[in-house]
Swiss-Prot record:
This is 3-isopropylmalate dehydratase small subunit. HAMAP family: LeuD_type1 (MF_01031). It comes from Cellvibrio japonicus (strain Ueda107). Belongs to the LeuD family. LeuD type 1 subfamily. The gene is leuD. It catalyses: (2R,3S)-3-isopropylmalate = (2S)-2-isopropylmalate. It is an enzyme of class 4 (lyase). The keyword Amino-acid biosynthesis applies.
């Protein structure tokens, strides 16, 4: 998993509440269990004017020119500004996969659906909850200034605007450790590899009959 330390990223808007996981990545694209390749279909029903199909090339598909992610000013954005209850709906882990594959490293919102919130941390995506008034301010500043960038410092737990104003955010210490060090469930297990091997060696000596192979 990619580590997350400091991000200086262009911000893009998803200015609507209750964005569910089917809106983030529609159900017809959930056949793959690989974590890559979903970015082209992120917000598919909003980005395109036609109905997206699995394994379909997105080149030449008619774009919804009124959808912000299709605006030139938001190309290459890595911070998504969102509204309350982002990621509600079904528990599909493909939602953070699609956001990550598109290029987003962080989502800032007043609130998140619990399962989506947890899935983000497992996939190297940093969900940040800020007070609704602060999120409103960030939206206003972003709309007023093209090329609006936010600096996110995970170690310091701050979001800093181009004017230098900083806002603190809360994060569980264990999740913070995992993101800073790029540790998913497998990475966490490998951190304990020496202890696991030592236990297996000791257990084999204490109870060798458990390891006998029946021939």
């Amino acid at each position: 998993m990619k580590s997350f330390t400091v991000l200086d990223g262009l911000a893009a808007p998803m200015d609507r509440a209750n964005v569910d996981t089917d809106m983030i990545i529609p159900k017809q694209f959930l056949k793959s269990i690989k974590r890559t390749g979903f970015g082209k279909n992120l917000f598919d029903e909003l980005r395109y004017l036609d109905e997206g199909k699995p394994d379909q090339s997105c080149e030449g598909r008619p774009l919804n020119t009124e959808f912000p992610l299709n605006f030139p000013r938001y190309q290459d954005a890595s911070v998504l500004l969102a509204r309350e209850n982002f990621g509600c709906g079904s528990s599909r882990e493909h939602a953070p996969w699609a956001l990550d594959d598109y290029g987003f490293r962080s989502v800032i919102a007043p609130s998140f659906a619990d399962i989506f919130f947890n899935n983000c941390f497992k996939n190297g995506l940093l969900p940040i909850m800020l007070d609704e008034k602060i999120v409103d301010q960030l939206f206003r500043e972003m709309y007023a200034s093209e090329g609006y960038r936010l600096n996110i410092d995970l170690a310091e737990q701050t979001v800093t605007t181009p004017s230098g104003e900083s806002f603190g955010f809360e994060i569980d210490a264990f999740r913070k450790h995992c993101l800073l060090n790029g540790l998913d469930d497998i990475g966490l297990t490998l951190e304990k590899a020496d202890k696991i091997r030592a236990y297996e060696t000791r257990r084999r000596a204490e109870a060798p009959w458990l390891f006998d192979v029946v021939k």
